[in-house]
Amino acid sequence: MKLRPLADRVIVKRVDSETKTASGIVIPDAAAEKPDQGEVLAVGPGKRTEKGDLTALTVKVGDRVLFGKYSGQTVKVDGDELLVMKEDDLFAVVEK
């Protein structure tokens, strides 16, 4: 199955967080928090203004983004857990 986001929605795949701290302590899966970073897999066409004009999204496929731990709607596609969320739910793009 393939998803195509509508309007100002984006599809994000969570990026796993580090399982070891800087001091070398291993964090078990049960204690690890949900990652709050992800990679944008797909973007919608944009948001309509009151005049009907289409405003393109500022994020693009491949961007690494920050979002709230409980943001978006979780969906499973081909065994992968993905998030569908509005661009407004994203906090920032991580620059490389």
From Swiss-Prot:
Pfam family, one: Cpn10
Keywords: Chaperone, Cytoplasm
SMART domains attached to this UniProt entry: Cpn10
Cross-referenced SUPFAM superfamilies: GroES-like
Highest taxon in the source lineage: Bacteria
CDD domains recorded: cpn10 (cd00320)
Gene Ontology cellular component list: cytoplasm
GO biological process: chaperone cofactor-dependent protein refolding
Function: Together with the chaperonin GroEL, plays an essential role in assisting protein folding. The GroEL-GroES system forms a nano-cage that allows encapsulation of the non-native substrate proteins and provides a physical environment optimized to promote and accelerate protein folding. GroES binds to the apical surface of the GroEL ring, thereby capping the opening of the GroEL channel.
NCBIfam families recorded: PRK00364.1-2, PRK00364.1-5, PRK00364.2-2, PRK00364.2-4
Protein's UniProt name: Co-chaperonin GroES
Organism whose genome encodes this protein: Variovorax paradoxus (strain S110)
Gene encoding the protein: groES
